[in-house]
Curated annotation (Swiss-Prot):
Enzyme class: transferase
Keyword entries, A-Z: Amino-acid biosynthesis, ATP-binding, Kinase, Nucleotide-binding, Threonine biosynthesis, Transferase
Annotated GO biological process: threonine biosynthetic process
Organism: Burkholderia lata (strain ATCC 17760 / DSM 23089 / LMG 22485 / NCIMB 9086 / R18194 / 383)
Matching CDD domains: HomoserineK_II
Family affiliation: Belongs to the pseudomonas-type ThrB family.
HAMAP family named in the record: Homoser_kinase_2
Entry EC number(s): 2.7.1.39
Protein name as annotated: Homoserine kinase
Catalytic activity: L-homoserine + ATP = O-phospho-L-homoserine + ADP + H(+)
Cross-referenced NCBIfam families: PRK05231.1 (NF003558), thrB_alt (TIGR00938)
Domain of life per record: Bacteria
Pathways involved: Amino-acid biosynthesis; L-threonine biosynthesis; L-threonine from L-aspartate: step 4/5
SUPFAM superfamilies named in the record: Protein kinase-like (PK-like)
Amino acid sequence: MAVFTAVSDSDLAQWMRHYELGDVLAFRGIPSGIENSNFFLTTTRGEYVLTIFEKLTAEQLPFYLDLMSHLAGHGVPVPDPIPRDDGALFGMLHGKPAAIVTKLDGSAELAPGVEHCIEVGQMLARLHLAGRDYPRNQPNLRSLPWWQENVPAIVPFITDEQRALLEGELVHQAGFFASDDYAALPAGPCHCDLFRDNVLFAHAAPDTGHDVRLGGFFDFYFAGCDKWLFDVAVTVNDWCVDLATGVLDVARADALLRAYQTVRPFTAEERRHWSDMLRAGAYRFWVSRLYDFYLPRAAEMLKPHDPGHFERILRERIAHTPALPEIQTACN
């Protein structure tokens, strides 16, 4: 969510003519992230987010925006795209597709505890089940084919030890993806990027008995149809780790995974390949962070992520991964 494309006051005024959102009160760029240009937009009708899509094409974009509308319609708290005056969910701004979505309540919890992980686990399972009847199909664009395409471009910049890990894990994952067990894993629309800064929490009502309330999931622009276990692995690799070492926090991981299973129990194949999928989740973000670090795009505001974080996580997952926790029958 960096700003690669600037939007002037006159650009915004022209753009807003296609929406019935009242008068603009405030507009500012969002500096975090690395993929799209994002802006907070406040009008007399409410608070929104304007996104200019720097890589996604007009042909690809309906998958993401329609998925968000679908999930919102099924009670999953996600940003809801706002239709334009012609009924479309996006238009063109500076020659690039752009959209306005509702802004969720709450703030990110960057130091999550067990209760936060329980909320995330349950809602992620609800998201997966809500997407089962979503009619569009688009693969996760940052999966195995993307890794195979981009790893060669990264290799000249890294050490021999890193290269051995990067290329060796790619061989391992290619074999896993080609297996019958992988083909049997449950799949459907996935968020694919459910990090702690893509989830908002609000204060719970006093009569609920809870300290936190999930405000919603956002930033669906890496979403795709993938194995649900991959989505869980990506989530656990961020929500349930010690940030300094990449080691899993067993209490948080156990809480998230048990909460997920109260909504959707894991299959036998998923249990067998939990370690492989945690490695896949770590590998995906190590590759993308290496690529963005060594081959960056120009941006007005950009905060690059540390590739070493996911290298540490990958090494940890190769060395040790606890089994998926069992749950009591009464919780099913």
